Amino acid sequence: GFGCPWNRYQCHSHCRSIGRLGGYCAGSLRLTCTCYRS
């Protein structure tokens, strides 16, 4: 979701839009957008 696995930047932007520091594509096939705070 949110651009994963192909568009990592879209995931990162989504995470920033909800108040996180950024995000990356995670999971076995990098299908999940995972946000991080620090």
UniProtKB/Swiss-Prot annotation:
Record key words, sorted: Antibiotic, Antimicrobial, Defensin, Disulfide bond, Immunity, Innate immunity, Secreted
Example GO BP: defense response to Gram-positive bacterium
GO cellular component: extracellular region
Superkingdom per UniProt: Eukaryota
Localization terms from the record: Secreted
Keyword Transmembrane helix: no
Protein name in the entry: Defensin-1
Organism listed in the record: Crassostrea virginica (Eastern oyster)
